[in-house]
Each structure stands twice: as structure tokens, then as C-alpha cells.
């Protein structure tokens, strides 16, 4: 069994339809990323992340968040960078485990007729993500494989975002039923599973995947993405469009 943990970086919204431009302060990109592992690796990954937390004097209950400030963690800036690097190195141990979907929001809202709001953008990102993980499982086991895939994501914690969760669940189920013009998604479980990221080491690692990819596109900073590269999905020595899809 494969388990995919997903998280995002940047906001899916922030576009002014009337002015046909991004709202001031909105991110240029929205990134949805996933970290896929085999079920047998679950406990080992949790142990590795806990060891890194302990090394940096953090409680194992402390959530590893990409956007945490070093002050809030009681670290110096250098310690904080080393800590983030070590978290990324955990992910890098798992080859072809990471997929990132990078949405140029202004371009998507202007040029894609089926993307009209943040729900559409998120749903389209999810579809592209599922497609690439399905391709990866097919590459490993052949087109007729029946190995199940379960997808977990961070739960939202307020009423407004719970509405987004419901829309995302609908999008997931629709994607599972329809697939894409290239392939179906029969191996994915019937429902997307929501989990509190504070209690999931793997969702925390997915957050680092999304953060590192977002940092590269939004700020042109590849420092942490370069650490992750061994884990990013590759096919025929190609990452672009395969492990990282810019849309």
C-alpha cells in the first residue's frame, strides 16, 4: 500500500477578476505538493523526524512547520537553517517520492476557462498531483497493478476552511471517478482523508516539500529544493513536468 501526504504553500486565491490581476500582497504562485511512501516506511519516517526534533531541543510534539520562525523555536538563524536542511534530508532518502504542482495563478485565472476561483485552482492542482503519483505507481508495478493508494491532507480548523475541505473532497472523488485523458485513478481510495498536521509527521514533511518548491518559484531560492532533489519524481532523467509540473 502507498500513502500520499499532501500540503500546500502560497494561497490559491488572491485574484481580482474585475481588474484581471493579482491582489496586492498575494503570492504569484500556488504550490500543492505530495510525499508518497510505502506503508511499511511509516514508523521509520516518524522516528527519523522525532530524532531531528530532539537534536534541536524540540519536543516531539512540536509541529515541524516550514514557515515557523527561528525565534519561535528558540534557535539561531544558522541552527534553524541546519534544522530545515536535516528535515529535507529525511525526505531525500525516498527516491521518486515527491511531486509538486506549481500554479502560476494570474496565468491560470486569465487563460483557463475551467479555473474561476480558488476551489477550481485547488481542484485542478489536485488532479495533476494524483495523475503523477498514479503514473509513478504504474512505473513501479505496471499498468495492471491493484496496489491501493490512500491520500491524506491537513485538516482545516475553522468553518470557512471546512467548506474548502468539503469542496476538496468532492474534487478528489470526481478526479478518482474521471481521471485524466491519459489515465484513470482506480487505485486511489474512495475518500480523501483529513488529519491534523500537528499529529502527523508525514504531513509535516509534505509541508516542507511544498515550502521548498514554493521558495524556488516565488523567491528564486533553490537552497532547500536542491536538498530535496533526490526525492523528486523523475522519469527518463527528467523532473520538469514529471516531478514538478508548472502550470
Regions found by a protein language model. Name each.
Residues 1-247:
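Phosphate-ester processing/binding pockets and catalytic centers
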Amino acid at each position: 500500500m502507498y500513502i500520499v501526504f499532501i500540503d500546500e504553500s502560497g494561497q490559491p486565491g488572491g485574484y481580482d477578476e474585475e481588474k484581471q490581476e493579482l491582489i496586492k500582497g498575494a503570492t504569484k504562485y500556488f504550490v500543492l505538493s505530495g510525499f508518497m511512501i510505502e506503508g511499511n516506511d511509516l514508523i521509520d519516517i516518524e522516528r527519523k523526524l522525532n530524532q531531528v526534533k530532539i537534536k534541536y531541543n524540540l519536543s516531539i510534539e512540536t509541529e515541524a512547520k516550514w514557515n515557523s520562525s527561528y525565534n519561535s523555536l528558540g534557535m539561531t538563524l544558522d541552527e534553524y537553517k541546519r534544522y530545515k536542511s536535516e528535515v529535507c534530508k529525511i525526505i531525500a532518502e525516498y527516491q521518486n517520492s515527491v511531486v509538486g504542482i506549481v500554479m502560476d495563478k494570474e496565468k491560470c485565472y486569465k487563460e483557463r476557462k475551467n479555473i474561476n476561483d480558488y476551489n477550481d485552482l485547488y481542484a485542478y492542482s489536485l488532479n495533476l498531483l494524483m495523475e503523477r503519483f498514479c503514473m509513478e505507481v504504474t512505473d513501479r508495478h505496471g499498468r495492471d497493478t491493484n496496489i491501493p493508494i490512500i491520500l491524506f491532507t491537513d485538516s482545516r480548523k475553522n468553518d470557512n476552511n471546512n467548506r474548502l475541505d468539503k469542496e476538496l473532497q468532492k474534487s478528489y472523488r470526481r478526479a478518482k471517478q474521471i481521471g485524466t485523458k491519459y489515465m484513470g485513478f482506480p487505485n486511489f481510495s474512495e475518500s480523501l482523508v483529513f488529519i491534523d498536521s500537528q499529529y502527523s509527521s508525514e504531513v509535516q514533511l509534505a509541508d516542507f516539500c511544498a515550502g521548498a518548491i514554493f521558495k524556488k518559484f516565488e523567491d528564486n531560492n533553490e537552497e532547500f529544493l536542491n536538498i530535496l532533489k533526490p526525492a523528486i519524481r523523475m522519469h527518463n532523467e527528467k523532473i520538469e513536468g514529471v516531478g514538478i509540473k508548472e502550470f
